[in-house]
Regions:
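N-terminal/domain-start alpha-helical segments
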Residues: 1-111
């Protein structure tokens, strides 16, 4: 399974990517929305893990841009925003699931 992890916080991005790779997932990662859009335009992924608070292009814009051309690739939002309104906005924009930070890798893998 090929994943794209989009997370601006370097320590968290590296930690999650490392754990995913050890679990057998082929994982690309990037730290801003602009790089994410470039990767999404050039590559195919089985799952996108998307933070909302990103530099250059925010996560919600990345999601809406992806959904204009790709309705199939599952997107799981990983965000510190944990209000119900944030979750509803993300799901309404086309995310398949929403996981609030902090999270445990076992919870991520279960989804």
């Amino acid at each position: 399974m090929r994943l794209l992890l989009i997370e601006d916080e370097p320590t968290l991005r590296e930690s999650v990517a490392k754990k995913l790779r050890r679990s057998g997932y082929e994982t690309d990662d990037c730290g801003d929305g602009e790089a994410a859009l470039e990767l999404l335009a050039a590559e195919r992924y089985d799952l996108v893990l998307l933070d909302l608070n990103l530099p250059k292009v925010d996560g919600m814009t990345v999601l809406r841009t992806l959904r204009r051309t790709d309705l199939e690739t599952p997107v799981l939002i990983l965000s510190a925003r944990s209000e119900i309104s944030d979750k509803v906005e993300g799901l309404d924009a086309g995310a398949n699931d929403y996981l609030a930070k902090p999270f445990h890798l076992a919870e991520l893998e279960a989804r």
